[in-house]
């Protein structure tokens, strides 16, 4: 019996699911006549009817046909778009928690309206995840028109929003945003010191657009929030001076394929001579090695106008695959500082990790997850294994007739671009629209200059001009249009032959000062007339374009991922339109240089072909496909590795975040503190009495340690004798019981003292604040230690040990040690903090926990969310009713301020680069100087003393 691959095995039963989806779509279509007869008010009233039926026990599955029919009709009335049969199938697949595989141009954005509307009825919030802010804002405004017509609230999460704006956005029925923004909000919620600062209200249902890009490509790079660590080092500038003196293949070697460098002995000698040191690799100089490596990487592997641009004295990363500038984002591990030194701009400080999570583990938080993409079949096994998601192929609405031509390979880049310009000019003259995909800003500008020389009118869409991208894309399908795009993948806008009427109409209305969010009534009133006018204008042009052969997509280079190439091709031939595509390649392309470029060059040399004569051979196409497969496999291994290591952290993170949320929500921590006292005193006693005989116990040292912890009221000499008499017979158990009783009695006296100073119940408030402060600090230290552990764990392989197993074992031990340290420091703080009654304040200072009563007052003043699932502040208010409110108290020396000057690091749209985004500008003078190793040793050597403290449209 032939064996089945895992991918094929996972697709068994797909046919049954597709048949089920067809039956559902038929049922929805059968309800259309009934829904069409409803007035706008009756259609809108259906939402409340569905909510009432849901509260009365009907399930969302039972409501699906009617809800889909209502949303479908609303789409037609509001935006003049009616869901096709296959889009209803896709919407149902999403509702059931699957990935709907829908080809480019099949209307994934419109499809998402159906499951988003249905699941919003439950009132627990729906998150629609896109790849960038532009698409999130566009989709929330565009599809939000339909949802608002039906009485639902929609909102969007954008970078740069304040916590109050984010909280309001999450309170909406449907929230749009990027994967990075959703993930960072989750991490920030677990760093806040006040319930009022929480923004998210749970993880109910998410629809991920371009799911393969977000859950596969970008999953290689974890989300990281960092804070200032090292002060800017003089060594960045020093090594930026030395790097140009070093010669490639003489002083160092570069592996472009693996993106690594290696310094030769000659290079080490030159550096030692420049720095005036004897040995670069001796212990005192070891930190300099990383500065050297980064300086060479900045020189060889990071190219200006390809990987980054310099604007206003700042190095800004360019997403190589999408061509977008990622303003404010930064490379980690000192790489960004090395590039800043190379470009002679201001060098900003390094950071250390404060909170982190992988996209895999973030999206696993959702009760139900689904996604849409045009290319998920090849990753079916990974999607099932990691996210438990099935991939359902949705048929196309019309058959695809695009012609995909074979690749043309030229010997040099110059010859390739000359041929590209000739091809484009020829097609432009006959009126065929052309879309050219490039891989960098530099190449798009080079082509632009060539077209200008030849007198070809064209538009450029790249990292420097993507603000105008909607208008450029809307006009890219007009006859004779030539559009140069850094990369089309993820742009999310269809190129419609003759022009995109919806986008053109939207732009026209915005020029009149109308907006679907701020002036919805005027916008909707003007929409129909403007849209009809635009449609009439583009129809005649669309017929001309079809006669000329449809949209011609021309790729100037192959990308690492076949999926990116397919997405570029997929811009042509949408909805059964004619179209054509071809890739122009050269032996100088990066992919060719990384894989078998030399072999291909020798073949072309033997053929003795002129530079301007291309070859079109299956062998070359196979070599390219093989190279892409190798890169995809490498990236898959990286993703698996990232996930394996994060699994260790995920269990620890879950424990810490659950504990933290309980403290924030005002849970009575008295029992937990009493247990901490028991555990800490027991550990002290067990450590001192491990020898077994009273004569061997160092009770003086034990008492000295206990005195730093709490005011001990027992003299050890009374227990075991004063030295002159014979030692009294006492067991370790008896000693432990005596000291435990003494410690708990001391805590009772401490509680009475605190309540006397700041009012009844103040001890509970102090417990919460101390535990929160210590928990946060110990968790940050633990993340720092885990980072350090992971940096060097790979070396264990040299000792024939599995690095992952070693990381798991040592990580577990370190987490246990962190928890013990947390208990000890918390107990010390609670006994020794100097507490006084604080003067009444109109508002709580940031980062200071509020009392139960003030939490209730604040929560009751907060706007109620639109959906039944309450915000955390409201839950706390409900729990706090009837609780006695202590006076405000102030604890001297307690660090309960939140971290400042944060940096946010996450994946770019292609998932390739580790990037960071500087948070809101905040002063922070607490960054310690020194290398990571020095900071680590300093932290470890701290003394114990410091630890203690509308109308219906015509059809």
Swiss-Prot record:
Family annotation (InterPro entries): Helicase_ATP-bd, Helicase_C-like, P-loop_NTPase, SecA, SecA_DEAD, SecA_motor_DEAD, SecA_preprotein_X-link_dom, SecA_SF2_C
Domain of life of the source: Bacteria
Just give the chief location class.
membrane
> Where would you find the membrane-spanning parts of this chain?
none
Which UniProt keywords are given for this protein, alphabetically ordered?
Answer: ATP-binding, Cell membrane, Cytoplasm, Membrane, Nucleotide-binding, Protein transport, Translocase, Translocation, Transport
> Enzyme class, one word?
translocase
What GO molecular function terms would the record report? ATP binding; protein-exporting ATPase activity
Give the compositionally biased regions (Low complexity).
874-888
Membrane-related topology note = Peripheral membrane protein
The record ties this protein, via Pfam families, to:
P-loop_SecA, SecA_DEAD, SecA_PP_bind, SecA_SW
Q: Give the span(s) annotated as Disordered.
A: 861-955
UniProt key word Translocase: yes
**EC code(s) of this entry:** 7.4.2.8
Would you name any one GO CC term? plasma membrane
Reactions mediated catalytically: ATP + H2O + cellular proteinSide 1 = ADP + phosphate + cellular proteinSide 2
Which compartment or compartments is the protein found in? Cell membrane; Cytoplasm
GO BP annotations, alphabetical order: intracellular protein transmembrane transport; protein import; protein targeting; protein transport by the Sec complex
Q: Basic residues composition bias: which ranges? A: 943-955
Indicate whether Membrane appears among the record's keywords: yes
The record's annotation in HAMAP family points to:
SecA
Q: What does this protein do?
A: Part of the Sec protein translocase complex. Interacts with the SecYEG preprotein conducting channel. Has a central role in coupling the hydrolysis of ATP to the transfer of proteins into and across the cell membrane, serving as an ATP-driven molecular motor driving the stepwise translocation of polypeptide chains across the membrane.
Assembly and partners are described as: Monomer and homodimer. Part of the essential Sec protein translocation apparatus which comprises SecA, SecYEG and auxiliary proteins SecDF. Other proteins may also be involved.
Name the family the entry cites: Belongs to the SecA family.
Protein name, entry field: Protein translocase subunit SecA
Annotated organism of origin? Rhodococcus opacus (strain B4)
Q: Which gene encodes it?
A: secA
């Amino acid at each position: 019996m032939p064996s089945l691959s895992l991918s094929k095995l996972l697709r068994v039963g797909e046919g049954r699911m597709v048949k089920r989806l067809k039956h559902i779509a038929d049922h929805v279509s059968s309800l259309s006549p009934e829904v069409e007869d409803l007035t706008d008010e009756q259609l809108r009233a259906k939402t409340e009817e569905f909510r009432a039926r849901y509260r009365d026990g009907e399930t969302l599955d039972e409501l699906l046909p009617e809800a889909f029919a209502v949303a479908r009709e609303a789409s037609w009335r509001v935006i003049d778009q009616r869901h096709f049969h296959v889009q209803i199938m896709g919407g149902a697949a999403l509702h059931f928690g699957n990935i709907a595989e829908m080809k480019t141009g099949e209307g994934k954005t419109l499809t998402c309206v159906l499951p988003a509307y249905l699941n919003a009825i439950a009132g627990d919030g729906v998150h629609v995840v896109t790849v960038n802010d532009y698409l999130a804002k566009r989709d929330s405004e565009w599809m939000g028109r339909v949802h608002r017509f039906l009485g639902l609230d929609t909102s969007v999460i954008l970078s740069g929003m304040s916590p109050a704006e984010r909280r309001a956005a999450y309170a909406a029925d449907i929230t749009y945003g990027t994967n990075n923004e959703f993930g960072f909000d989750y991490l920030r919620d677990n760093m806040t010191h006040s319930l009022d600062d929480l923004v998210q209200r749970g993880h109910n249902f998410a629809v991920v657009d371009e799911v393969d890009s977000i859950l596969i490509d970008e999953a290689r790079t974890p989300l990281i929030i960092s804070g200032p660590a090292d002060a800017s080092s003089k060594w960045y500038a020093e090594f930026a001076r030395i790097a140009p003196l070093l010669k490639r293949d003489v002083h160092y070697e570069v592996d472009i394929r693996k993106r690594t460098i290696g310094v030769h002995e000659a290079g080490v000698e030159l550096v030692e001579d420049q720095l005036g040191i004897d040995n670069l690799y001796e212990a005192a100089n070891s930190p300099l090695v990383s500065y050297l490596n980064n300086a060479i990487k900045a020189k060889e592997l990071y190219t200006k106008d390809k990987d980054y641009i310099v604007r206003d004295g700042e190095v800004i990363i360019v997403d190589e695959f999408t061509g977008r500038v990622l303003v404010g984002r930064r490379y980690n591990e000192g790489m960004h500082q090395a590039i800043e030194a190379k470009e002679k701009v201001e060098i900003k400080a390094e950071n250390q990790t404060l909170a982190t999570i992988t996209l895999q583990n973030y999206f696993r938080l959702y009760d139900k997850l689904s996604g849409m993409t045009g290319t998920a079949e090849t990753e079916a096994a990974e999607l099932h294994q990691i996210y438990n998601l099935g991939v359902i192929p949705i048929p196309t609405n019309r058959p695809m007739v695009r012609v995909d031509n074979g690749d043309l390979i030229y010997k040099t880049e110059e010859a390739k671009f000359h041929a590209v310009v000739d091809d484009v000019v020829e097609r432009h003259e006959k009126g065929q629209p052309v879309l050219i995909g490039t891989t960098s800003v530099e190449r798009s500008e080079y082509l632009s200059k060539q077209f200008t020389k030849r007198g070809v009118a064209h538009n450029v869409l790249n990292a420097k001009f993507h603000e105008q991208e909607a208008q450029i894309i809307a006009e890219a399908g007009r006859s004779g249009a030539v559009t140069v795009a850094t990369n089309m993948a993820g742009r999310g806008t269809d190129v419609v032959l003759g022009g995109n009427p919806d986008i053109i109409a939207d732009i026209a209305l915005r020029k009149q000062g109308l907006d679907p969010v701020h002036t919805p009534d005027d916008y909707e009133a003007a929409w129909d007339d403007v849209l009809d006018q635009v449609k009439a204008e583009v129809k005649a042009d669309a017929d001309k374009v079809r006669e000329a052969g449809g949209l011609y997509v021309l790729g100037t280079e192959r990308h690492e991922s076949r999926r990116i190439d397919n997405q570029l091709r997929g811009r042509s031939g949408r909805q059964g339109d004619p179209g054509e595509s071809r890739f122009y390649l050269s032996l100088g392309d990066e992919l060719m240089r990384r894989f078998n470029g030399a072999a291909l060059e020798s073949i072309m040399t033997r053929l003795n072909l002129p530079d301007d004569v291309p070859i079109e051979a299956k062998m070359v196409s196979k070599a390219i496909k093989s190279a892409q497969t190798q890169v995809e496999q490498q990236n898959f291994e990286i993703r698996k590795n990232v996930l394996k290591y994060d699994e260790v952290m995920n269990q620890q993170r879950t424990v810490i975040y659950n504990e933290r949320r309980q403290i924030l929500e005002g849970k009575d921590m008295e029992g937990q503190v009493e247990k901490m006292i028991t555990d800490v005193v027991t550990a002290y006693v067990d450590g001192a009495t491990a020898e077994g005989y009273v004569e061997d116990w160092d009770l003086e040292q034990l008492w000295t340690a206990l005195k730093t912890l709490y005011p001990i009221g027992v003299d050890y000499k009374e227990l075991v004798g004063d030295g002159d008499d014979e030692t009294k017979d006492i067991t370790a158990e008896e000693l432990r019981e005596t000291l435990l009783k003494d410690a708990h009695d001391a805590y009772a006296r401490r509680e009475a003292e605190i309540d006397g100073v700041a009012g009844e119940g103040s001890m509970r408030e102090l417990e919460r604040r101390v535990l929160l402060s210590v928990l946060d600090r110990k968790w940050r230290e633990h993340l720092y230690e885990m980072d350090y552990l992971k940096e060097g764990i790979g070396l264990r392989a040299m000792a024939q040990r599995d690095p992952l197993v070693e990381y798991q074992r040592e990580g577990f031990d370190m987490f246990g040690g962190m928890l013990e340290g947390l208990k000890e420091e918390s107990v010390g703080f609670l006994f020794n903090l100097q507490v006084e009654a604080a003067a009444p304040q109109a508002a709580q200072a940031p980062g200071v926990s509020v009392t139960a009563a003030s939490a209730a007052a604040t929560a009751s003043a907060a706007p109620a969310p639109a959906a039944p699932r309450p915000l955390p502040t409201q839950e706390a208010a409900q729990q706090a009713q009837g609780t006695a409110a202590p006076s405000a108290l102030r604890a001297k020396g307690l660090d309960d301020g939140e971290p400042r000057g944060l940096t946010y690091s996450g994946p770019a749209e292609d998932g390739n680069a580790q990037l960071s985004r500087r948070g809101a500008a905040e002063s922070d003078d607490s960054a310690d100087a020194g290398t990571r190793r020095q900071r680590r040793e300093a932290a470890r050597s701290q003394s114990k003393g410091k630890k203690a403290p509308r109308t219906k449209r015509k059809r």
